[in-house]
Amino acid sequence: KPKVFLGHSLGEYSALVAGNFINITDASILIKKRGELMHSSIEPNISGMAAIIGKNAKFIDGVIKKNNLKVVIANDNSPMQVVISGLIEDIISSEQIFFKNGVKRFVKLNVSAAFHSNLMNDAQLELINEINKINFKNCNIPIISNYDSTINSNIESIIYSLKNQMANRVRWTDSIKKLEETETTQIIEIGPGKVLSGLIARI
């Protein structure tokens, strides 16, 4: 029997289905709407994301604040990998600043918008309306939230976190550290690859 569920970004919906908090039909409705809103909320190709390799989120946050950069951390994937979001022009202008501060690699990602950033605020508000229509169920197996990396089986807390996920940071590093508190001895990744297993190995 599983001890806890968690998923990365879109994968959190899969985790909610696996944990029986939501049925697969309702999850599919939310996922479809989420995708539509994320791609229609901002003009295509004016915003994006970039992966920064070699520094942790605390360090990247410091560089952003010190240099008044107009980008935000979207994904705290591991102590050595952080993804930022923002307008394309702001991502480009930040690249050399990050290199000057010791970043090893800066990789612009092939995405259409600045996901998990404040540029998704309007889309998030619309998605909340859809989430409010869904019938969620309580479950005795907890889930670790992307939004605040807390362990929850309380359905109100889970819904609150889900409502705030789209426009905020995915706290994957903190989530895995929280997982360690459950004394979990085996992690099973379910998905098309082994990306998360690779990230977990670095945490």
Feature-to-residue mapping (PLM):
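Conserved residues at the C-terminal ends of beta-strands
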Residues: 8, 109, 190
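Flexible, low-complexity segments
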Residues: 1, 164-203
